[in-house]
Swiss-Prot record:
N-formimidoyl-L-glutamate binds at residues 142, 317, 319. Keywords: Cytoplasm, Histidine metabolism, Hydrolase, Iron, Metal-binding, Zinc. SUPFAM superfamilies: Composite domain of metallo-dependent hydrolases, Metallo-dependent hydrolases. GO terms for biological process: L-histidine catabolic process to glutamate and formamide; L-histidine catabolic process to glutamate and formate. Belongs to the metallo-dependent hydrolases superfamily. HutI family. InterPro entries: Amidohydro-rel, HutI, Metal-dep_hydrolase_composite, Metal_Hydrolase. HAMAP family: HutI. Binds 1 zinc or iron ion per subunit. This is Imidazolonepropionase.
Amino acid sequence: MRCDRVWINARLATLAPGRQGLGIVEDGVVACLGGRIAYAGPAAAAPTFEAAESIDVDGRWITPGLIDPHTHLVFAGDRAHEFELRLAGASYEEIARAGGGIVSTMRATRAASEAELIAAALPRLDALLAEGVTTVEIKSGYGLSLDDELKSLRAARALADIRRVGVTTTFLGAHALPPEYRDDEDGYVDLVCQTMIPAIAARGLADAVDGFCEGIGFSPAQIRRVFDAAKAHGLPVKLHAEQLSNLSGAALAAEYNALSADHLEHLDAAGIAAMAASGTVATLLPGAYYFTRETLVPPIAALRAAGVPMALATDCNPGTSPLTSPLLVMNMAATLFRMTVEECLAGVTREAARALGLLADRGTLEAGKACDLAIWDVERPAELVYRMGFNPLHARVWRGL
């Protein structure tokens, strides 16, 4: 078999559906041709390769490249001072009334140029890449005007031209109410549905549409309007749901066959059943749970029992999860949410790909999929979940390079 390069003497965690557990292959080989996996499996069953390059990984573990399916990487400014205020006892509402919160980030993002947003996002992206991330989802949602949302999405797309990484973009105009619409919520939803979504779809700048369904965000009726507009323009949807309260957002998302419903601390049985029926992925965000000192854990056992796929993400954002470590996310999911090692590793690979609608293309080590790999200096895959403040990444491979 002709191939561009082959990795030999490897241990594989393929995460392939149908294989038991992590899909472990103790003496494995991965071969790449044209940026796609040509073979991933036991050396004993491998064809004879005619490879331009052969790489001996000396018994290291190879997993699919990690995928971060929920981030807000593109923003300007920071909210460290608000963190200090919260530690001193100020409530989120008090900080918001004083001009902080999402509106603070909105002001900084609006004031920044596209080039400045790219420059600010690069260190955050680089931190993800340093831990094996090969695909990242990036949301808008800090511009909250047509021009600034377009600017944010262009900046997110530009990151894929600067770094070797896959980027998917999500329009999150229904994130918060900008000050100029303080007394006209439905007027802002009109803007999102009638102006922003058509303009963004026409430019091909978004791969999906998201919303924040909460008492401090947007109502289910308003989110339904956003979803209808998204569907009218051929865009799949996803939703921040049940983070702070239960507004049945997950069930609403499932009604629209959403790719994912995210957060889910307050998810109920009806929402779980709806997600299971629609195949909507539960994207869990333990960093936000930790940082906001939430006490209600997402219903992991019920999600597991219902067969709802569970993805994990950093939720990197300046207000509630200033986190750029998928390895720490896995540890948090195991320790705080009681997820298994297998669930954690699947959550940042296979199920993360599923949450982005990309499972046919990446997220597992299978022939035909993108040759996105993470090669690790560990003795067993559980170390990736078990250890904290530890980065054993040996090499990151994107599209075979």
